[in-house]
Amino acid sequence: MKKPTKLRLEHLVKLDPLTDNQQLAFNSFASGNHLCLDGSAGTGKTFISLYLALESVFKKEYDKVIIVRSAVPTRDMGFLPGTQEEKEDAYTAPYKAIVNDLFDDYGGWTKLIEDRKIEFLTTSFIRGITLKKSIVIIDESQNCNYHELCSVITRLGEDCRFIMAGDYYQSDFTRKGDQDGISQFIKIIKNMREFDHIEFKWEDIVRSSFVRDFIMTKEMLERGKID
């Protein structure tokens, strides 16, 4: 079947929650709250975030989705070789795959970029921007330091939604100050009425049973629960 040249809401593959916490994320988003999705890999945090955000954009509730990431480990894409687009490819690949799956269209990501319904930024390039009528997703947020997280959230202008997705056991930071900064930011948003913090557990891992077993064993070792 020929794929559409312009994507619409009816082209978005219907996604149903697979676990109680996924359902909680759906319900919380529908209530109008900002989200902090925290937990293990394979629980669908990024997939859900993009689905909910794109559905809202195609319902014309917002103009576009903006995906934000910290450029770890360089923290500045200027250190990477190639053009700006080539530099971004290293970071956008997971989102391209998800978007293409959500629309069952290999060219889905490109079509949304061309239609200005989705945009990718790093924290290095967000300063000085005021974001309006957008859903902002900070993915891999465990790799943003306190200053970066504050910089992003204070960019939000009128009619914006904010979604954080990360696994705070798996930060790339080695400095205690950076780790403490993430904890401080989480404390702030937990005390905001407009935020819902949803913690995904091992039972929420839906990628595969093998991945679930691996992550459970890995995290139990890291936490000293097994030898």
Regions found by a protein language model. Give the residues of each.
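Conserved helicase motor core of SF1/SF2 NTP-dependent helicases
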Residues: K2-I138, Q142-D227
